[in-house]
Amino acid sequence: MKPMQRLTCLLALCFAASASAKVTMEIPDTIDLLVVNGSSPKLSGGFFDATKKLELEDGEQQIVFRYSPYFSQGNDRIIIDSEVVIATFDAANQELRFDMPKYRDAPQATKAIKTMQWQLLDQQGKAVELRQDRLIKEGMQIGRNFEFETAEYNKKGGVAALTSSMAVQPIAQQEISNATAMAAAEEMLHFWYNKADAETKARFKAFVNQQ
């Protein structure tokens, strides 16, 4: 093989190895992933899938999420929401999953979820080292702009603030308004879907699948 051909093959192999080095996260339906690295997350998987996937570049990561375990009570589904968690960690070429507390029923969850202990585990089952905090907002919770709140949190240098350059990127006012509207619409959609009976949910699924 000629030297130029060998160099070309070597570069191709290096590029392929670099391109395949990703961080993947398994997102169960009890995790409401709100912000990833300053932006709305792009998850793979269908709307009704119990688990979705998130793919990230290697490096420092920041996630904002809410844990929402649910319980059956007669014909109703009871959802208990945690406070909004913000966490920062480093990851490279890893497969990560949430390790969240399990609750017997809604009353137990209501009592214990405010002090919940959770972890991110890698493919070997080892806990990922991370820094975490709560993203607190007083008053009305519906329609919160989590991207804006996260940016403000990072500017103030909280415990789980990003240290990379993406932490100080400005957010345009129009983007803030659009993000707020989308967040509110999605939150209300999930709220009313979980309140619906089985027949209404079936009609809604049929409608979504036709779009």
UniProtKB/Swiss-Prot annotation:
InterPro entries: UPF0319
Protein name stated in the entry: UPF0319 protein VC_A0026
Top-level taxon of origin: Bacteria
Record's keyword terms, sorted: Signal
Protein species of origin: Vibrio cholerae serotype O1 (strain ATCC 39315 / El Tor Inaba N16961)
Family recorded in the similarity comment: Belongs to the UPF0319 family.
Signal peptide from the UniProt entry: 1-21
